Amino acid sequence: MKLVHGIDIIEWNREELNNPLFAKRILIDNELEYYFQLNSSREKKRYLASVFACKEAVMKALKLKYGYGDILILKTENQRQVYLNKILIKELELSISYTETYIVASVVGLINNMN
């Protein structure tokens, strides 16, 4: 077993967060569907930044080469679940925090070696 941790911080005013093409590069399946259902550009920007930070934190924690399309972040009532290649990774815990300027995502877990 191996303890893993990944963290990512994103500034809200990043220009690419306003770009639907960037959203299509980062988001998949349910994430993309949810994104396009949001009404305001502020909500879209916040959601995209959140998922982007989460996926970056997952990639850093696992230290493996995955694309954004390989990772799905699913928010449930009690937590955010991480799916890797459509398989739930129960060993990872994801936390996210917001300020007026930044979003930070942190992932920790105790996993079997994935190499």
UniProtKB/Swiss-Prot annotation:
InterPro entries: 4-PPantetheinyl_Trfase_dom, 4-PPantetheinyl_Trfase_dom_sf, ACPS. GO terms for biological process: fatty acid biosynthetic process. Keywords: Cytoplasm, Fatty acid biosynthesis, Fatty acid metabolism, Lipid biosynthesis, Lipid metabolism, Magnesium, Metal-binding, Transferase. One of its GO terms (molecular function) is magnesium ion binding. It is an enzyme of class 2 (transferase). Mg(2+) binds at residues 8, 56. SUPFAM superfamilies: 4'-phosphopantetheinyl transferase (SSF56214). Its cofactor is Mg(2+). GO terms for cellular component: cytoplasm. Gene3D superfamilies: 4'-phosphopantetheinyl transferase domain. Coiled coil: none annotated. Its EC number is 2.7.8.7. Transfers the 4'-phosphopantetheine moiety from coenzyme A to a Ser of acyl-carrier-protein. Belongs to the P-Pant transferase superfamily. AcpS family. This is Holo-[acyl-carrier-protein] synthase.
